[in-house]
Every structure is written in structure tokens, then in C-alpha cells.
Amino acid sequence: MFMLPLGLMAQTVKGKVTDSSGEGLPFMNVIVKGTSNGTTTDDKGEFSITVKKLPVNLVISSIGFKTRVINVSNSSYLTITIQDGNESLEEIVVIGSRNPNRTAIDSPVPIDIVDVKELTAMAPQVNLNQILNFVAPSFTSNTQTISDGTDHIDPASLRGLGPDQVLVLINGKRRHTSSLINVNGTFGRGSVGTDLNSIPSSAIKRLEVLRDGAAAQYGSDAIAGVINIVLNESVNELSLVVTSGAHFSKNSNSQTGGVDGETTNISASYGLPIGENGGFINFSGDFDVREDYNRMKEWEGGIFNGYNAVERFANAANYDTTQFLSLANGLDPASTDYNTILNDLKGFANAAGYNTTASDGLSELQTILNVDATTSELAARGLERTDFNMRVGQSKVRGSRLFANFKLPLDNNGTEIYSFAGLSSRAGNSAGFYRLPSQSRTFTPAYINGFLPEINSTISDQSLAVGIKGKIGDWNVDFSNAYGKNAFDYMIGNTYNASQGVASPTVFDAGGFSFTQNTTNLDLNRFFENTFEGLGVAFGAEHRLENYQIISGEEASYTQYQADGTPFTGIAGTSPLKDFYGRSRPGGSQVFPGFGPQNELDRSRSSVAAYVDLDATFSETFSTTLATRYENYSDFGSTLNFKLASIYKASDNFRIRASFNTGFRAPSLHQLNFNSTSTIFEDGVPVEVGTFANDSKAAKLLGIPQLKEETSNSFSAGFTAKLPESNISITLDGYMVNIDDRVVYTGQFKGPGTGSELDRLLVQANASAASFFANAIDTQSKGVDLVITHKANLGENARLKSDLAATFSKTEQVGGIKASDVLEAAGLVDTYFPETSRIFLEESVPRTKVNLTNSLTTGKFNIFLRNVYFGEVSEATNTVANQQTFATKIVTDLSLGYKAAENLTLTVGANNLLDVFPDRAIEANRSGGRFDWSRRSQQFGVGGRFLFARVSFNLK
């Protein structure tokens, strides 16, 4: 029904934008007036744009230059001269309004436009999370360490809110989230984010960051804002970029200095025109290799005990030390074998320097040998304390990504088929806590000196969106379907199931999980030019289907065994395998116990939504947007939200804007259904924690309320201003976001140890404590965002662009903890929402962040200088006395680019040029030397100085 008679064939318009001296101007915006069809000039000032028909009006604009409107009536090559001026950036944006003529500066809500091509040409960062972290102050994301799967997918935040309160779009279509839910000790604990690093930066034309609630326009998750990724549309242009670098830091290589964390990224992009009507397909992709780095200096705690010394002497005599362990695992004390082994043990203990002459039995030997023997054993074994270090820092990564963006116009009236698709695969490798030989979780006959277990991840991501849009009468119609899937699989290496004894493998398939989302949209919009001063009307419907799965691993990855090799069930009279001291050996693969059949699940849900969006311009000075959206979920019910936003043009150079909206976020399928057992370290002490579903029997026993949606209301107000005499533009926006029934990950509930039903459930889960997802608190977030932009010519060949962006924010708990009567009566309210969880929400990311970026282009050279001010963060711990505050820091990036040839640019530079580190942790938070810098509250990471070199080819 979208097919209309063909008109004139589309045309490609090419040209060059120059300043008054004839010098080409890069990064100028070239837009077909009244549409969102646009491009930017390259580093020579040249552009190419496909238009549906001629004649057409092109709008040429950029900060610091006067905007020009050029009427193009033929396809001859254009040379367009732009005069210096005071016009601000008027980039037409996709998000925040469905008015096709709305620009960022005329938007009633704050929108940041991030030119990814410009940044990746000069800035050190190449992945999307880090690009945004250093360019958008309201956005925060850092690599994590010793946090299981979160080492491999970086959590991200907008305005200090959770990773699951930011909606991500690609070309205006909803992007699926990750399959990983963060349950370890990091910011974003208990939430599910979007894996932005699965999208290659070479595939991105620009980013649009909407810093305002938008659930009434886009649905669930848009409480903090929206990030829209606009894909690359370039054709007949091959872009190839190779970036390589490493950390050259005083704290590299376990704080001895040197080079580590080597990284190489190779990206490419090429587009082909299709047909004669402006169609195209663009392919973009990259491949990267990232090595790990380690910032742990030296383990300072105990390593060996007296029994380990006995083992060393026994091993030297080729004695089977597993016989010693049989003494604590059911061997009959009256048997001949028992007494023989006991006497052998005494003999080796005496040889090791322990006097066992007066000891009569095993318990006395256990007491005698239960002493620290670290110093003597290190010397005897020729080892150093550094041999027992962990890998505290970034994980290893090998990854590749491929994206395609396609459009095929079918006529000259806007009918077109479009599609975009992505594939990515990443293999990650990180390590956990070192398993020391003195611990019960180390089976020393297999690992005499302990071991460093590794988490190997395989993360795959696929997406495909297909749509058709055109006109029915005077209405623009867009029908689309977007599919996405993310899967995360665990392979645990260099590890052991200590409860399995000699039968344990050292590599385990621990299972994994996947998340799939399919979204179908029908959108209609029309612009009424003669209603008021213009009225945009949009309405539409959406259907979304989601599926979440947990896949079990092999039996040994999740099972705790008895001494006879059968699974331990917790039945009275049975016990798991014990170590020499009689301590139970934990089951499952060390560092990450696998998912078992009891965890396995396949859950789906659907939602339907309908929306209406009105954008009215009442006069040349005042316009208003009103949006409302109804949404119904199959698993928790319906919600109705609205948004009202207005902008008033007080003068040509000053605008005032404000908005109010309500919002919601449905609990994710992950939060509703995730269940597993994992090893969580609390103050350096390992605890097997079972995560139980919110509707589980354990949740009911403890009085954990059923999960429901988060609801929000938010208000923002601000202004945009231009200072014509100084070529400066300013935006300032204040905001307040109130969220009720915020979903958190609780603390650890321990069983009473009386054989209760909760105790039995914990044993069945191979856990000693239980955690849940719950609507525990209300929060309020408030702050101010400031953006100042200046662009100027310095002489004939030099241009300086400066951007100052800052955010000042605060998130805090409002009111009391929403605990049930059962929790109140049991005195477990502080476990339900502990201090650690409060700090993760309020103080674990910088509340203040300021970014000052300067880019100077002169002749063949480009100089990039950026300083980022990171505000204070606090250590997330339940011990109030140890809640250390880490002071503010400034990180400096610097690069120098040189255009060596027409199609070749060379760039060298540094991230964190001055090798700045966060404050060191106080002694109580160092965990015996494991963490000299906080692993729970990251300001900007602990990599230190990163030096890079880049070669960029651009062939047309």
C-alpha cells in the first residue's frame, strides 16, 4: 500500500564548504531543509548527499559560522562559502520530538549531539562506553574488576541513575538489553544494562543523548533519558583506522612500572550506492585485542599453614597425601589403615618441625598444625608473595563487530525500505580471588600452591531491524520490526571443584543465559503547517516480546559432593567432603559455580503500547510538546504516562525551556527470574550466596514482597543562550527525578542454622546465604547540567573549537526502607537494604563531572586537549568507619594529528597524560594488599597513563 508512482529520479549533490579564505571547513552540517536527511563535511570540507528530487534547499550550519540556505537546482559541483558568525549548532535531531524540523537548540528538553567520527579521529577512546564517559559528563561507565560477568560488560549510567533506567535506540528503534544481570560488588548492582560495546564506533554517524525522562514517548526504561545511535550512511568512501596503544604507568605490572594492557583496534567502513534513487548499504566493523593489566602489588596475608608444610615433606617422599584427607572424611578410627596413616602424618609433621610426640589423635594434630607457616614455606618452596597475586584490573578481550545499514527508496515521495543489522562476538578472560593453599576451597593434591581461577566468557550479540515507510495521503507511515538477542556463556578455567577431590576436572562448562527481544512498531505522523504556527501530530502502537533463558552447565560445575563421590543433599547424617581440618569443601567450580537444572528456565512476556505525541508551535516564540503513552505488560499490568514540555523564545539569542513527565520501568525478566549461586567476597571473606527468584519459597519465608514496576516523575527547567559578540552558545538545565519502589539487590540473609526450611533451601542451592531483588526504597535525583560551546577562527588557517560541559548531581534515598512486617519483626531491615547498597546508589559514581575540550586545527595539524574533572566517590561497605571518600581528580587527554597525505592522517596521543590515579584505599579496605584502589567505587579506572598511535586512511 506504500507504493506510489515514481517521480523524478533522486540526485546526488556534491560540493565543498569553505571559509572566506577558501580553506575547506570540516564537520559542517549539510541538511535538506525540512527533513532529517543530512551529512557532515569531511576533513577537506567536502560533502556528498543524496536528495529525492531537485530543486532542493540545503541548510549549511555550524557553531561560529553564519547559517546559509542554498537553493540547488542541478547536480553541478557546489562551492559554498560560509562567513564567520554567531549562529549556534542547529542539528536536526531524531529523539525528544517527532517534529521533523526540530533542532537541538529549539528542543524543549536537553539533547547532546556527539560527533563520533570527529572524536574517533582524535580522542584516545575507541569503544562507545569510553567515548561517552569522557565526552558527556552526565554519562558514567568504567571497566570493573573481580566482579564475575561484570568484568566483561561495563555498566553505564546517565545522571547517576541505574544502567536499566537508560533506554538505547538505534536509528530511533529500541535496542535490546544485555543478558547479564549485575549481582557482584559494583555500581549498577541488581540491574541490567545495554551492551554498548557490541556496536562498533565506525558504524556510528552521531549520538543523540536526551537528558530527560521519556517513558511517555518511548516506553519502559527511559526514566533517566535516551541514547539514540544514528548509523553511518556514507557511500563510495573507504575508511580504515588502526589504533594501537598500551598503559605506560608507574603502577603498571603490579606497581613495578613499565608497559601493560596492550590494545589494538582495527576498524573499517565502506558504503555502496544502490540503484539510481539514492539507495545505499553501508558496512562497518572492527576487530580488537585487549590484554589485561594488574594493579595488585603484593598479597600481605597468610598463605600456608602447618598442614601445607607436612604436605611438602610428604610429596618429597612421593607419599599420596590424599590419604591424610581420608582421616577427616569417614575412615574408621578403629581400622588399621587409620592408625597407619595417622602415624605417617605424625612422622612428616615431626620432619617439618612440629612436635607431635604427645598427640594421641587427629583433633590434637589439627590443633598443632593450625598455625601460620607462610614465611618458612615461601622460603622452602622458592616462592614470593607476588606469586599469589590476583589480576586486579581490566580483563582480556578478543572481539569483532559488524554492522550494516541499508536504505532503498522506492519512489520520490518518501517510500523506502530500510534495514540495519549487527553481529558481534567477544571472548573475555578475567580472574577471581586467588585460592590459597591454606583454604578449604583449594584441593592441594591437585594445586600444591593454590591457583588463580579464570572466568572465560563468550558474549554474542545479533540484531536485525527491517521497516518500510512512506505516505498514505498526507500522513507519514513507518512500519518496522526489530529483533535482538544477547547471549553470555561461561567457561571456567584453571579451577577445581574442591568437594570432588581427585576426580575434579580443571575446566568447567558453567552454562550461561540469553535474552531475546522482538519489537514491532507502527508509527504515523503529520505536520500541519496551517494549524497555529505549525502542529506535529504523531501516534502509533508497539508490540514487544521478550524471552529470558538460563542454561545449565555440567554437573561438576554446580554440585557439592560427599566423600564417596555422590552429590551432597543435606539429608541428616550426610556431609560434604572435608579438608584436613574438618571444614566442608564448597562445591561447584571455584570462582563461578555453574548453573544447575534447578536454575534452568525459559521465561517470556509480552507488552503492547499505544501513544499520542503532539508538538505545537503556537507562535514564533512559543511551542509545546504533549505526549501520552499507555502500556500493558502480560506479567504485571498496565501503566499510563504523560509528558509536557515547552520552550519560549525570549529573543533571537535566548530561549527558556521546561518539562514535566511521569515514567515507569517494568522489572526486567532477569530481575523477576534470575537465580544462581555465586561466590561473593565480603571484606575479603568468600561467601557462597544464592540468588533466589522473587516468588521463590525462600522469598516467602523471609517476607520479601513481590516485585512491581518502578514509577517516576521528573521536572526539568533551563535555558539556551547565544552570545553573538563572542561566538558562544550556552545551555543550562536543572532537573529533579523522583523514583518510587526502586528495584535493588538485597543484602545476604543467612539461615538460622537450626535445620529450618530456609536452611534446607540454602543447602539445596549449595549456598550459605540468600539474596533477592526487591522494591526496597524510593530515591530522588537532582542536579544541574551546563554546556558552553565556543568556536573561533585564529588567523587565516587556524580554527579553535572549545566545549565546556559539566554536571552536578545528587541521588539519595527518600524516606525509610520498605520492609515487610516479617523483616521488621526479625530485625532484618538493614540486611534488606544494607549500607553497601545505599552507597552503590548514592555515592559510587562521581556526583560532579566537568569536561573541557579544545580542538585546534591549523594547516595539516590538529591538536586535541581535554581535561575531565571527576568528583568524589565513596567506598561501598557496610562498615561505616571504613566508608572512605576518594578525592576529586583531573584526567588530561592530549593528541596531535598530522595529515601526511591526501588520504592519510597520523595521530599520536595519550589518555591520562599525567598518570593520575584515584586516592589509595585505607588499610581497612585493602583486603590484605589485594586492592590498593577501590574496586567497588570507580571514578575513572586504575589503568593510569595510556599512550596510543593511530593511522587513518580515507579513500574516495
Please give the residue ranges for each predicted region.
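Short, acidic, small-residue-rich periplasmic hinge/interaction motif at the N-terminus
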Residues: T18-E23, M28-K33, N57-F65, S73-A121
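Short acidic/polar hinge/loop motifs at secondary-structure boundaries
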Residues: F47-T50, K173-R211
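Extracytoplasmic beta-strand/coil segments of soluble accessory domains associated
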Residues: S48-T50, N129-S179
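N-terminal periplasmic accessory domains that precede
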Residues: S76-Q83, L128-I131, A156, T194-N197, ...
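C-terminal beta-signal and adjacent terminal beta-strands/loops
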Residues: S178, I739, K810-Q813, V868-A876, ...
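Surface-exposed extracellular loop regions of Gram-negative outer-membrane beta-barrel proteins
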Residues: N232-S249, S254, L365, V371-A379, ...
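Outer-membrane beta-barrel transmembrane domain signature of Gram-negative proteins
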Residues: Y447, F451-V466, G470-K471, Y483, ...
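Gram-negative outer-membrane beta-barrel transporters
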Residues: F539, G734-T877
